[in-house]
Amino acid sequence: SITISASQALHEVVLDDHPRLLLFLPLAHCFARFIQYASIASDDGVVGYLPDTKTLLPDLRSFEPTYLLGVPRVFEKVYNAASRKAGMGWKGRLFLKAAESARDWSRMQQAGEKPTMKQTAEHLSYEASVYHTVRGALGPRIRYVACGGAPLDVSLAHFFNGIGLPMIQGYGMTETAAPFAAT
């Protein structure tokens, strides 16, 4: 039943062409197990396993996952690394403006609002200069990110949504064998 639940809850992810998951969370983590089963339930899903995260970024680029599961700290590190790489000068200011624009874009989408032409142009500009680089660090085929294990800061979820990586959040208890909800 957990496999059926996983494929139903995450149907958009597992119906993606050739879904690929690179898993580094322990399988004792119920959402990791759940999302792994969603991949396996797909006709052509592939799951890769990492024993630790020491080589995570090169492994992401070589494995080319279509979605990634992590705990909030992983996504905080991705954001902080991108911010740090941008630096303190004009690139740093550009990154901060792009990050705020991504969060605003996500909030507008969530509220069902239409962006203005100026907002659309700004978003496309940041796509070309910032967003594709952040996504590229997670692998060239990444389409979704999933988070479980602890509450994720809302602004961080909006950042990933706004750069074109829908954030799936899982909630549940290991004792129940599966997440209670995935949004």
What are these regions (language model features)?
Residues T3-L23, L27-Y131, R141:
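Conserved AMP-binding/adenylation subdomain of ANL enzymes
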Residues P26, G149, G172:
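Active-site glycine-centered loops adjacent to acidic/histidine catalytic or metal-binding residues
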Residues L68, G149, F160:
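Residue-level signal for inorganic ion chemistry
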Residues R73, A150-P151:
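Alpha-helix/helix-capping structural signal
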Residues K77, K97, S155-L156, A177-A178:
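Phosphate- and divalent-cation-binding pockets in alpha/beta enzyme and binding domains
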Residues L152, N161-L165, M173-T183:
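Active-site loops of AMP-binding adenylate-forming
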